[in-house]
Amino acid sequence: MITPDEAELCYPHLGNYSCRRIVRPHSVYVLLYIILSSISVLTVTLNLLVIIAISHFKKLHSPTNFLLLSLAVSDFCVGFIFIFDILLLDNCWYLSAGWCMFHVVLSIIVPTASTGSIVLISIDRYIAVCDPLHYPTKVTVNRANISVVLCWFCSALYTLGLLENIKHPGGFNSCIGECMPLMHPVVIILDIFLTLIFPAIVIIILYVRVFVVAVSQARAMLSHVAVVKLQGSVKVNKSELKAARVLGVVVVVFLLCYTPAYLVSSLYGTLSTFYFVKCLYYFNSLLNPMIYVFFYPWFRKCVKYILSLQILKSGSSQHTVKRESC
């Protein structure tokens, strides 16, 4: 018969070698599983729609949209990572040490690549708004694709060098049933700087510059300073500024969702608190495609086209879609 103390262990038959589990009422577990599973499914589904839309429709094959595709891929992966975190609701890991390491590595590579994609998108918008005449030559599809590949490669390389227990899965666990990354305190501080503080500074500086240019252009248009010859470029800048505003919303949501998780992890908060902010951290991946749905008519049009299975028709990739940068 299992005693109350043994009921709080992940592996009761191992006694003190087992990690302690978080005991919650059954109704709370059911509610959490339903909510978190729904978030996971929605995250995977919505980001899959973004991936299909940009990949399938050739009219959307622009440098900015390929950077957005990278962000959607990372958000899509987050939906699967979330499944592992649902398994950790009671603070117990019941899968093998190899799967634990896979989860840990993926949970660092994907958010790091997501942050890198956000930075690349910010740079893209900065060049498009602040240097529109040279944008077509500076930012090409090939350069965007190379940037995306380098972003993911550096994220993987960074993650492999970050973890101390990568070569010995489960060898440094304090108890059986634990699945946590092992990092030196100095490395944790360095990680916070490289994956949050530094990217946030770069993003904020770029968007402040974009905002200043947007305001100056608006004033110039209102005071009729713009020369007639520049009307064409001003029209282009309007669409670029619209894209910059939408991506500005993406960046703000990104910072609001990611900052609490990094602050709590650096301060070694309690597990329950950390789990809440970790969910907020992953919830950002669900919000991104929802932002596109609300702000971009072309995305809603693509979704209808995909869900009606019209993309299976011959020549559907050439379907006319309003070509806007995301």
Where are these regions (language model features)?
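Extracellular N-terminal segment of 7TM GPCRs
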Residues: 1-45
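Loop architecture of class A 7-transmembrane GPCRs
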Residues: 11-23, 92-108, 137-145, 152-204
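Juxtamembrane loop-transmembrane helix junctions in multi-pass integral membrane proteins
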Residues: 20-34, 56-62, 66, 95-101, ...
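Extracellular TM2-ECL1-early TM3 structural module of rhodopsin-like
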Residues: 22-37, 63-123, 128-138
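Helix-to-loop junction signature of class
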Residues: 36, 53, 77-92, 104, ...
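Alpha-helical transmembrane segments of multi-pass membrane proteins
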Residues: 40, 70-79, 112, 147-159, ...
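Seventh transmembrane helix
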Residues: 202-203, 253-266, 276-326
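Intracellular effector-coupling site of seven-transmembrane GPCRs
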Residues: 212-261
